[in-house]
């Protein structure tokens, strides 16, 4: 067995509310060449003739439903154009700011998806990078009420524009990967696809962080006016500051978290849609090369993650050391359809006359998808205070994205924070993400072929085609 180790900055992980472990973003990708011996592993619907020993690769990929080539794919077939954000919002009620943000993002389904995720169990977010470094200097997100109040007063009056500008369709520097013609180049392709996605996500989040700050400023200015109105013009400056701090403590953190939840759900879903449909458009017409790819998800959360660099896993697919089962594929495809993402295809395990999707069952005893998203957001919004340890720790128990302090729960703590881990050996979102491992079937480029070996010499030695499996024949003709 030939091993090739390639460094890969794979998706880092976040933590589930209430469970705290160190996240380790580094990972590697391991490519190995392994000869497979399968007698017609794609029977029936997948396009292979049961009476023919030679695998018909073109027929196999042609049989896959191309109904996924839809209007959605055509929209994302090219990079999205620059789309500048509206001017920073002025002071307005939390409800008005929420509606404005939803309209500015063009995300009418946002609240519906957030509500639906209350009844989902899939971990779609903990394998995504947190990018907490983007938030370490945003004092408006401090867990200290005093610091938030000072930052809010310093931001008066409301700026007329963002500086630098906020582009809601900002793109990264990585080039879009093209599907290789040869399976020998698959490992490079998988690395490139992931790098492209991570670059797009990172760049877009830089702009979204500035957008969040603009909405937090507007929210604070509204709360400042609310404090003034409650005093009705009476009282000293000290009374006004006391009232303002009380209003911030009671309302700011909760409302800021609501805005952030909508904003970052849109970030993750929109970037993943764009990249995934572009990948789908290029992969769907080149599916044959992926028959040689062996894909391994060491943890279920990596399989449930929003982003998949390969959408046509027609080779061997392994989930947590066992062959991927069709019902698992159906369930994750059901969620992907709800999110507007292309389905994952896997020719070896798909069953004839069976739908590609099946609704997953929900368990109230397991963590919820909204909890994974909420904690991903918490890691960002707590970054300022984590980076400035002089900040008092006690306000952590006062706001809606707080951690557990001495076992106490804040009013905004999610259900997940009150739950014990599913089992002592369960993989938690804060655990290190293991390396992504994919394998490539041996080809002419990876096999050590004797220089004097020819097809004629093999026939002279008594080669019998009728006794060879289709995969063996494919390898021989590759040679």
From Swiss-Prot:
The keyword Phosphoprotein applies. The keyword Ubl conjugation does not apply. Signal peptide: none annotated. Keywords: DNA-binding, Host nucleus, Host-virus interaction, Phosphoprotein, Transcription, Transcription regulation, Virion, Virion tegument. It comes from the Viruses. GO terms for biological process: DNA-templated viral transcription; regulation of DNA-templated transcription. One of its GO terms (cellular component) is host cell nucleus. Pfam families: Alpha_TIF. This is Tegument protein VP16 homolog. It comes from Equine herpesvirus 1 (strain Ab4p) (EHV-1). The lineage of its organism: Viruses, Duplodnaviria, Heunggongvirae, Peploviricota, Herviviricetes.
């Amino acid at each position: 067995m030939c091993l090739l180790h390639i460094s890969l900055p794979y998706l880092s992980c976040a933590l589930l509310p209430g469970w705290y472990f160190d996240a380790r973003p580094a990972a590697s990708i391991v490519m190995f060449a392994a000869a497979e011996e399968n007698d017609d592993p794609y029977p029936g619907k997948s396009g292979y003739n049961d009476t023919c020993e030679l695998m018909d690769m073109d027929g196999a990929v042609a049989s896959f439903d191309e109904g996924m080539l839809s209007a959605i794919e055509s929209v994302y077939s090219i990079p999205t154009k620059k789309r500048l954000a509206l001017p920073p919002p002025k002071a307005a009620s939390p409800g008005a700011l929420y509606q404005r943000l939803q309209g500015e993002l063009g995300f009418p389904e946002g609240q519906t998806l957030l509500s639906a995720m209350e009844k989902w169990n899939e971990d779609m977010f903990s394998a995504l990078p947190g990018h907490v470094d983007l938030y370490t200097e945003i004092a408006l997100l401090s867990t200290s009420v005093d610091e938030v109040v000072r930052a809010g007063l310093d931001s008066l009056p409301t700026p007329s524009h963002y500086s630098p500008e906020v582009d809601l369709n900002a793109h990264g520097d990585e080039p879009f990967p093209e599907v290789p013609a040869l399976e020998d180049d698959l490992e490079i392709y998988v690395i490139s696809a992931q790098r492209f996605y991570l670059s797009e996500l990172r760049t877009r989040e830089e702009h979204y962080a500035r957008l969040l700050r603009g909405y937090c400023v507007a929210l604070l200015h509204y709360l400042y006016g609310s404090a003034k109105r409650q005093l009705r013009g009476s009282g000293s400056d000290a009374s006004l500051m006391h009232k303002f701090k009380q209003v911030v403590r009671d309302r700011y953190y909760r409302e800021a978290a609501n805005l952030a939840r909508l904003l970052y759900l849109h970030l993750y879903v929109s970037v993943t849609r764009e990249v995934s449909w572009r990948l789908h458009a290029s992969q769907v017409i080149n599916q044959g090369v992926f028959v040689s790819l062996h894909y391994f998800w060491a943890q279920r959360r990596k399989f449930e993650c929003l982003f998949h660099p390969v959408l046509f896993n027609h080779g061997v697919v392994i989930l947590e050391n066992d062959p991927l089962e069709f019902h698992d594929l159906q369930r994750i495809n059901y969620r992907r359809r709800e999110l507007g993402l292309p389905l994952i295809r896997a020719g070896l395990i798909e069953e004839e006359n069976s739908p590609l999707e099946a609704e997953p069952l929900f368990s109230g005893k397991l963590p919820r998808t909204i909890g994974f998203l909420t904690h991903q957001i918490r890691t960002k919004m707590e970054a300022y205070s984590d980076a400035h340890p002089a900040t008092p720790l006690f306000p952590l128990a006062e706001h809606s994205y707080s951690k557990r302090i001495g076992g106490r729960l804040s009013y905004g703590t999610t259900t997940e924070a009150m739950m014990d881990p599913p089992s002592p050996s369960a993989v938690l979102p804060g655990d290190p993400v293991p390396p992504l491992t994919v394998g490539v079937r041996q080809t002419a480029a990876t096999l050590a072929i004797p220089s004097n070996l020819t097809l004629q010499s093999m026939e002279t030695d008594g080669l019998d085609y009728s006794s060879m499996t289709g995969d063996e024949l494919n390898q021989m003709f590759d040679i």
